[in-house]
């Protein structure tokens, strides 16, 4: 069956222009970025934004450092460019200065830490009280260069780098192990593009840990976190053990009999890998990443999500809750604007990026507190309950 991809609700502005060769991106470290931005507050906003759009980070920048750098920028354009720069590097390793040289734990110590993670996830999902929070999402998309059929002929539309396509602020409720979004606000509120993610409050944690226990978990490194030393495990999950569906809307399936395409959603369970960053004493997960194992030639060539967690004070008590997430999806365009569909056409890769911040937490219902758990006496870590709520990974779907 021949497939043709249709990107629905693609947002962006196109300006006819002659094709131009893009200048190579300058690769910089976090330390070099800090040096470049040391005097940014004295320069025009647009100038700093232009400078940031021409560089690429070679390592991840911490949220604390990102917040500090944003505060020193002259305006919203530069701040947006910095967020795009930082989020694009969210799945990279940390700067060398944040990697600690402490010896790796022995097998017994590593197993005890893994047991602590499992206990923490089980207690978090089962005993997290009913909460409400505001999820602020900024959606970014780029626009690949393409030839467009206009009224007077074919014109080349210049490529556009990642840019904001919308923002939304919706109330999210975590209740009875289920994450519920205010659908009315989603329907009538501002749109942020087509990338949708949910499940940060617990389902992602339980599903990744359960899958990782069926896959491969290895020691990563010690890192310097906000509160001191944190530990990192690497994990890899094969497709036969995976519960990670990559979803994309929409694909044209051409009917060989009448030539009329049937629109369907592309969905595939994929193998994936990532990192679990945690407090070695309590097992509390502070950061988790998921990256699908996809090849550059596939319909969807990249999909991933990173979620950060931190202590939030709610009604006088502290709970570990989501504070930030970054999700990304890359897919090939297959529908040329203003032109007839080509059954074998495969265009450039288009990127969708969501930056999400959680805040304004409030609590209702039970007085139950989160328990962090410890290693216990169990010799075999037990995975999270299969009753845990499912999550929705990064997906490009039609927004109504």
Identify the function of each model-found stretch.
Residues 9, 60-76, 225, 355-363:
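Short, solvent-exposed linear motifs at loop/edge-of-secondary-structure regions
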Residues 19-101:
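General marker for long, soluble alpha-helical cores
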Residues 92-273, 280-286, 292-305, 309-322, ...:
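Structured extracytoplasmic
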Residues 15-16, 69, 292, 373:
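Residues in and immediately flanking transmembrane alpha helices
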Residues 4-16:
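Bacterial N-terminal signal peptides
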Residues 15-21, 390, 399:
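Intrinsic disorder/low-complexity segments
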Residues 29, 277-279:
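Helix N-cap / beta->alpha transition motif
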